[in-house]
From Swiss-Prot:
It comes from Sinorhizobium medicae (strain WSM419). Belongs to the Fmt family. The gene is fmt. GO terms for molecular function: methionyl-tRNA formyltransferase activity. It is an enzyme of class 2 (transferase). GO terms for cellular component: cytosol. Keywords: Protein biosynthesis, Transferase. Its EC number is 2.1.2.9. Attaches a formyl group to the free amino group of methionyl-tRNA(fMet). The formyl group appears to play a dual role in the initiator identity of N-formylmethionyl-tRNA by promoting its recognition by IF2 and preventing the misappropriation of this tRNA by the elongation apparatus. This is Methionyl-tRNA formyltransferase. (6S)-5,6,7,8-tetrahydrofolate binds at S112, L113, L114, P115. HAMAP family: Formyl_trans (MF_00182).
Length: 311
């Protein structure tokens, strides 16, 4: 028989898994997602999460607790009588009472090959570190941070020009298929669980505002990885003097280039920038409040002369 599932997720990354599970015939008893957040131009409108909106389109009940500190919220969760909970980028810590609140437990779709990149930002960290491979894993959750036993895994290559946004979309697609397979195996009583290795643990800390600034004193390969690992969000950036004002410019695309100079020096008219070793060419940029533009279009509106310094 199809499983009775509670789905827990918030961003766009989670939506394909919700749709896949519903499409596979499982009964989605309820969807848990983070509460609506202020949005719009002035922050006056409350915006529902992508998962919230998807659940409403499917006529699935939606719950948005701020946390699970209230006994009533924990009791409501248990009273759904679910076979399992599926958690994909929910964004809230789950207490023991929730982890054990379904017949078979909680299963998390995590965007890395655990135990590498446990934590909040596995996609960005993998690219920023220059990894050539990552993947999706389904694990049974325990009280640790991404420490539970692994049920299924799929590896995904990270190509040299792939951005975090592109990898995000690929892993979201892979994760939906993998979780659907995991729930089918759980339904059949054939879902394996393997403890994670003790070696190779690396944590994917949340991206801080301070580290998004580009440090051109680093080698070109590291600068390139930094840029694509933060593209499109939150975006790596440098500062530039424009009409006497210091302005922050986001860089959403780059490639390794040739050339030497002082770190941050503009080497030519197509935005090759000297790094600590080698150079990177900036291929897509965005001014504050403006659109992301290819470098040639950006330069037509914002000239940056060769030999200038940026940072």
């Amino acid at each position: 028989m199809p499983l009775r599932i509670i789905f827990m997720g918030t961003p766009e990354f989670s939506v394909p898994t919700l749709l896949a599970l519903a499409g596979a015939g499982h009964e989605i008893a309820a969807v848990y997602t983070q509460p609506p957040r202020p949005g719009g131009r002035r922050g006056l409108d409350l915006q529902k999460s992508p998962v919230h909106q998807a659940a409403e389109r499917l006529d699935i009940p939606v719950l948005t607790p701020v946390n699970f500190k209230e006994a009533a919220d924990r009791r409501t969760f248990r009273n759904f009588g679910a076979d399992a909970a599926v958690v994909v980028a929910y964004g809230l810590l789950l207490p023991e009472e929730i982890l054990s609140g379904t017949r078979c437990g909680c299963y998390n779709g995590h965007a890395s090959l655990l135990p590498r990149w446990r934590g909040a930002a596995p996609i960005q960290r993998a690219i920023m570190a220059g990894d050539r491979e990552t993947g999706m894993m389904v694990m049974k959750m325990d009280k640790g941070l991404d420490t539970g036993p692994v049920a299924l895994a799929r590896s995904v290559p990270i190509h040299a020009t792939m951005t975090a946004g592109e990898l995000h979309d690929r892993l979201s697609e892979v994760g939906a298929k993998l979780m659907t397979e995991a729930m089918a195996r759980l339904e059949a009583g054939e879902l394996p669980l393997t403890p994670q290795p003790q070696e190779g643990v690396v944590y994917a800390a949340k991206i801080s505002k301070e580290e998004t600034r580009i440090d051109f004193s680093r080698p070109a390969a590291e600068v390139h990885n930094h840029i694509r690992g933060l593209s499109p969000f939150p975006g790596a950036w440098f500062e530039l003097d424009i009409a006497g004002r210091r302005e922050r410019i986001k860089v959403l695309g780059s490639e390794i280039s040739q050339g030497e100079g002082a770190p941050g020096q503009v080497l030519d008219g197509s935005l090759a920038i000297a790094c600590g070793e080698g150079a990177v060419r900036l291929t897509r940029l965005q001014r504050a409040g403006g659109k992301a533009l290819p470098a040639a279009d950006f330069l037509r509106g914002t000239p940056i002369v060769a030999s200038a310094g940026i940072g």
